[in-house]
């Protein structure tokens, strides 16, 4: 079965074509600057060079059309005919309380997605536009929506309810949702596979650490808590996001700096985190360089704040689950940052592991980085959200037949 996975951003479209018979990526690419001038498609068939195509893309529909043309093109494509695509899996950021799992898309599902726009005004409109365009261009091809929030819908109410007047939850569905669910789900399943243990008997803490970062407590294969909340602004310090701050800071800054609420939230989303503290960059590589090679004090402080918050969250989730069997690192920093992993794990060895410093040098590959005699296993597992989306799509489409 060949599955096209799509991730539509406000002005971009990331895609992968996967052959689920062997799990291989056949082609992948990125359409950028959709609806802006100088639109660009970067397309790559597995084993061949990247190809850049400059072509006007006024909207997502035109971008999808160009992607499909590239996939069936005699010279740069991989398919003979569009009919070879058996299904399309769409990444959708927010499924609200409607969706606890991936779902086959029909008109009813689209209505519910539109009802969630308030919860993800930056992401859901583009996700929906991509779905609608695909349904027009590829009528009759089954489509599946896979949600960033769905995996965390197993959180108990005491983990997701905010201690504010309950009527706001009833009226506006203000609660903790959590994000990066597809990544947390993939790496927790993969950890159980690698350890050859049933996931039902494991307590796993998954650390998705990148420009956006979140941690999940996965007990028996179900998410029981996660660090992001109503929006992806809650939780850890991130690349440019503040994570948890005292809400009174917002009104304090409005008053002192003459800013609107929107402007302060913008600062917390785009100018804070390790970028805000260091004043250098939101790229952890730049900050590590400045901290370790140039002795930059604020860069070092940014790294310490980031690591400290991750460490605290690992500790609190160990308490929430009554123990931990596995700690997993994934995403950009988690997969490729040996120094940061060591920083985070320092003083956590009382949980029942010893870090193998040699194995911890690994970057971007699956590896158990704790010593063999460690009771608690610490692992690096590169995330693969596209594969997880394709897997869910395959499962639902096979159920149709």
Swiss-Prot record:
The record's free-text note on cofactor binding: Mg(2+). Can also accept Mn(2+).
GO molecular function: acetate kinase activity; ATP binding; magnesium ion binding
Major site of localization recorded for this protein: cytoplasm
Keyword ATP-binding set for record: yes
Catalytic activity: acetate + ATP = acetyl phosphate + ADP
EC number: 2.7.2.1
Pathway: Metabolic intermediate biosynthesis; acetyl-CoA biosynthesis; acetyl-CoA from acetate: step 1/2
Subcellular location: Cytoplasm
Binding site for ATP: 14, 208-212, 283-285, 332-336
Cofactor(s) this protein cannot do without: Mg(2+); Mn(2+)
Annotated substrate binding sites: 91
InterPro entries (UniProt xref): Ac/propionate_kinase, Aliphatic_acid_kin_short-chain, Aliphatic_acid_kinase_CS, ATPase_NBD
UniProt site positions, description: Transition state stabilizer: 180, 241
GO cellular component, one term: cytoplasm
Gene3D superfamilies per UniProt: 3.30.420.40
Enzyme class at the top of the EC tree: transferase
Gene Ontology process terms (BP): acetate metabolic process; acetyl-CoA biosynthetic process
Subunit structure, as described in the record: Homodimer.
Name of this chain's protein: Acetate kinase
Taxonomic source organism: Thermoanaerobacter pseudethanolicus (strain ATCC 33223 / 39E) (Clostridium thermohydrosulfuricum)
Classification of source organism: Bacteria, Bacillati, Bacillota, Clostridia, Thermoanaerobacterales
Gene this protein is translated from: ackA
């Amino acid at each position: 079965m060949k599955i096209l996975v799509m991730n539509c951003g406000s002005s971009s479209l990331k895609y992968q074509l996967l052959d689920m018979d062997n799990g291989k990526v056949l082609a992948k690419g990125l359409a950028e600057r959709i609806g802006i001038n100088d639109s660009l498609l970067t397309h790559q068939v597995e084993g061949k060079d990247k190809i850049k195509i400059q072509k006007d893309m006024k909207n997502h529909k035109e971008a999808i059309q160009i992607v499909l043309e590239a996939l069936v093109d005699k010279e740069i494509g991989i398919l003979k005919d569009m009919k070879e695509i058996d299904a399309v899996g769409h990444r959708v950021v927010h499924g609200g309380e409607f969706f606890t799992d991936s779902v086959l898309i029909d008109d009813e599902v689209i209505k519910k997605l539109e009802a969630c726009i308030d919860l993800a005004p930056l992401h859901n409109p583009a996700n929906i536009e991509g779905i609608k365009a695909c349904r027009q261009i590829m009528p009759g091809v089954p489509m599946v929506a896979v949600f960033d929030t769905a995996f965390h819908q197993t959180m108990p109410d005491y983990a997701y309810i905010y201690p504010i007047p309950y009527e706001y939850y009833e009226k506006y569905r203000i609660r903790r949702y959590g994000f990066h669910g597809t990544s947390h789900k993939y790496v927790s399943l993969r950890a159980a596979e690698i350890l050859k243990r049933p996931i039902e008997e494991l307590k796993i803490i998954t650390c998705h650490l990148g420009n956006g970062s979140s941690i999940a407590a996965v007990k028996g294969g179900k998410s029981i808590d996660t660090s992001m909340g109503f929006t992806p602004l809650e939780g850890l310090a991130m690349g440019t996001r503040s994570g948890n701050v005292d809400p009174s800071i917002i009104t304090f800054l409005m008053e002192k700096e003459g800013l609107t609420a929107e402007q302060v939230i913008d600062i917390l989303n785009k100018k804070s985190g390790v970028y805000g503290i260091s004043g250098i960059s939101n790229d952890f590589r730049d900050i590590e360089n400045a901290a370790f090679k140039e002795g930059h004090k604020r860069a070092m402080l940014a790294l310490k704040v980031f690591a400290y918050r991750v460490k605290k969250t690992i500790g609190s989730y160990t308490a929430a689950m009554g123990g931990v069997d596995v700690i997993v690192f994934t995403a950009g920093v988690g997969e490729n940052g040996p120094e940061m992993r060591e920083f985070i794990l320092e003083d956590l060895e009382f949980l029942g592991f010893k870090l193998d410093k040699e194995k911890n040098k690994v970057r971007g590959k699956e590896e158990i980085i704790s010593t063999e005699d460690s009771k608690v296993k610490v692992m690096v597992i590169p995330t693969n959200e596209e594969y997880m989306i394709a897997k869910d799509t395959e499962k639902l489409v096979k159920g149709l037949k």
